[in-house]
Amino acid sequence: MSTTIWILLIIVALFGGLVGGIFIARKQIEKEIGEHPRLTPDAIREMMSQMGQKPSEAKVQQTYRNIVKHAKTAIKTKK
């Protein structure tokens, strides 16, 4: 084969690997965030305190469950 064809094959392979790597990394990050949201009950409690609310445990857990539920439904609707 000529050198030009080899160079084109290498460029196509690199581009395919780049696109595939980005796709796989994106799926893994979405899965990780869906399973373990970055907003924890402690962070919600702190935000409520800063807004002047007295955070009851029931309200904190309700807010946290709503956030987790929303994140999971957002991922499912993307698919």
Swiss-Prot record:
The chain crosses the membrane at residues 5-25. Its main location: membrane. The keyword Transferase does not apply. Keywords: Cell membrane, Membrane, Transmembrane, Transmembrane helix. Coiled coil: none annotated. It is a single-pass membrane protein. GO terms for cellular component: plasma membrane. It is found in: Cell membrane. It holds the Pfam family UPF0154. InterPro entries: UPF0154. HAMAP family: UPF0154. Belongs to the UPF0154 family. This is UPF0154 protein SAK_1616.
